[in-house]
């Protein structure tokens, strides 16, 4: 029995989602009295130069490298086998081995598909339980390894796909994707309208433009939406200062139809009062939207997990997917004028949402590692041969 386990959470800075999930899990462990929690960007610490290059290429996939990323994501999915797994497992291996020897964690959690842990576990015979927390509404084979003890997934759909691949159903827990605790609180909307100087009598369109130029023609879009009667447009630019300054010129023309913000710490507050939102289909953003039942317009998904996320939400009736710039204004305006459709999308979001996913995950992990002395986590009896 582990009375006060040491927890190692491994993540990667490819987008903010994986790191955000890691931090949310860390906070949840601490809230439950587990103080010895380490969060490590394994690839960033092990291979900083390679990581910087691949992060740059990842961000470029949003704008000019879509076909390259499509080839990588779906190509690896098709040919993933023991040779590729063995090659990929070497990334971060040396740093990980040092971490395990020095820190001696009792539990390891991956919020990014890092198979160095289960590979080391298999090769040197360590008995640390390993948990994978999937951060999208789909699954790539790179997440799967027979030495992983349990998987936490967003939906029953993901679980079914994994079972079809060969993962035993008892190793998969449908919890939802961990989101910041602020998204699970109740707040009086009047406070939010006052804080951001918004008009409660107008519909609101929230545009999450991001910091990497992934949403095209934002200024032109805002100009078009500003002409729509009884609509207030709110743009969150993140850390994109150039975009913020560009849009501030529009805002300063005197119209109250546009509000421009940079980085918003408590962005859940804007989610709570918007009629719908234009954004990219990242797994965490979609989970946050589901928590607050925000209808989403998903802008030009990148091939790979973004596209798979978008297809899932579109099929569920929770999202409108935009695949061409020419569709953005017309489809968004039509949705804003269709109250019945907005209500249906809210209900669809409600059906997708799983309450308190971080708490569910942490409680499950702690229960398994406190359950009995010498507890042995469930093992995969057999997995597809390609998963090593």
UniProtKB/Swiss-Prot annotation:
Keywords assigned by UniProt, alphabetized: Carbohydrate metabolism, Cell membrane, Glycosyltransferase, Lipid biosynthesis, Lipid metabolism, Membrane, Transferase
Subcellular location: Cell membrane
Entry's Gene Ontology molecular function annotations: 1,2-diacylglycerol 3-glucosyltransferase activity
Alphabetical GO biological process terms: enterobacterial common antigen biosynthetic process; glycolipid biosynthetic process; lipoteichoic acid biosynthetic process
EC assignment: 2.4.1.315
InterPro entries for this protein: Diacylglyc_glucosyltr_N, Glyco_trans_28_C, Glycosyltransf_28_UgtP, Pro_diacylglycrl_glcsylTrfase
Enzyme class: transferase
Domain of life from the UniProt record: Bacteria
A Pfam short name: Glyco_tran_28_C
Main location: membrane
Protein name: Processive diacylglycerol beta-glucosyltransferase
Taxonomic source organism: Bacillus mycoides (strain KBAB4)
Gene that encodes it: ugtP
């Amino acid at each position: 029995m582990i009375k006060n386990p040491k927890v190692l959470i491994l993540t990667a800075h490819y987008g903010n989602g994986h790191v955000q999930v890691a931090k949310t899990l860390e906070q949840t462990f601490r809230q439950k009295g587990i103080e010895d929690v380490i969060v490590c960007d394994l690839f960033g610490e092990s291979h900083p130069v390679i990581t910087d290059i691949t992060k740059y290429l990842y961000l470029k996939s949003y704008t000019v490298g879509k076909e390259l990323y499509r080839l990588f994501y779906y190509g690896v999915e098709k040919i993933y086998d023991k040779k590729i797994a063995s090659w990929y497992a070497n990334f971060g291996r040396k740093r990980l081995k040092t971490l395990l020897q020095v820190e001696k964690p009792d539990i390891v959690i991956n919020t990014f598909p890092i198979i160095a842990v289960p590979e080391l576990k298999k090769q040197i015979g360590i008995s640390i339980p390993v948990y994978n927390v999937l951060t999208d509404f789909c699954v790539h084979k790179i997440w799967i390894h027979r030495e992983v003890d349990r998987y936490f997934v967003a939906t029953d759909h993901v679980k079914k796909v994994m079972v079809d691949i060969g993962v035993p159903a008892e190793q998969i827990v449908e919890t939802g994707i961990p989101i910041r605790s602020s998204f699970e609180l109740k707040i009086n909307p009047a406070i939010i309208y006052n804080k951001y100087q918004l008009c409660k009598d107008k519909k609101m369109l929230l545009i999450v433009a991001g910091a990497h130029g992934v949403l095209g023609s934002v200024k032109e879009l805002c100009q078009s939406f500003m002409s729509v009667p009884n609509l207030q447009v709110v743009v969150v630019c993140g850390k994109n200062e150039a975009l913020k300054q560009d849009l501030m010129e529009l805002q300063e023309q005197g119209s109250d139809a546009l509000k421009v913000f940079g980085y918003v710490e408590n962005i859940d507050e804007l989610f709570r009062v918007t009629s719908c939102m234009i954004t990219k289909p990242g797994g965490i953003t979609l989970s946050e939207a589901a928590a607050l039942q925000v209808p989403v317009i998903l802008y030009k998904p990148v091939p790979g997990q973004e596209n798979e996320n978008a297809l899932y939400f579109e099929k569920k009736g929770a999202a409108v997917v935009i695949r061409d710039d020419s569709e953005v204004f017309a489809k968004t305006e039509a949705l804003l004028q269709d109250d019945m459709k907005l209500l249906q999308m809210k209900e669809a979001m409600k059906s997708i949402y799983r309450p308190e996913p971080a708490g569910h995950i942490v409680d499950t992990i702690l229960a398994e590692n406190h359950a009995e002395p010498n507890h042995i986590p469930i093992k995969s009896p057999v997995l597809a041969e390609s998963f090593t």
